[in-house]
Amino acid sequence: MTRLSPRARRALRELRAKGSKRSIEGMARYGIRPKLAYGVPAPAVRALARKLGRDHALALEFRESGVFEARALAALVEDPKALTSSEMERWVREFESWADCDSTCLSLFWKAPFAFEKARAWAKRGPEIQRRAGFALMAALAVHDKGAQDRQFLRFLPLLEAAATDERNLIKKAVNWSIRQVGKRNGRLNREAVHAAHRIAKLPSPSARWIASDALRELESPQVKARLKKRG
């Protein structure tokens, strides 16, 4: 690890002071077992991020530290306009758990100018966390990128169908999450996501059947239909 700046060291000391062994044990119960963690609650990490503000160089130092909470902090203080494609690739290879992956996609990666490109590329990867990142990023884009065109999300559907037979738990849940979020954007995408889910349901795979049934339960529900109709 390279030598950290005084500002980064102060932030890490503050994080460590807010950590607890009990929180680390709680993380483990959810399958979050990073190599190095302080056990800092998420609200405390977010509060520190607000105090620090956007800082690309500082974000890179936090990632370099290897500390789980510092890496979460990096995603919150990083400037998405300064984030490069190669840095995103490095980050996705360093993810240690679904929590690190999902929080980074939801708080940072979807804002990157090449987010759609990365989502499609990562969805074809082999390693479980990297592939999950592709689908987590799709879900984040579907929820947060209000200006994105339908065609960008339609390109996700074949990738979701292709991954539906991946029986790994983190992939199965991420594919389901993504198809549900895409299908809740508007009426057109709802229809296309429902069609995709019906195709997935016919695949000879327990994972595919679960993904389809759970997604259709929500996407065809009266509540979702009414909400989409109200949007027009």
What are these regions (language model features)?
Residues 1-232:
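Alpha-helical scaffold domains
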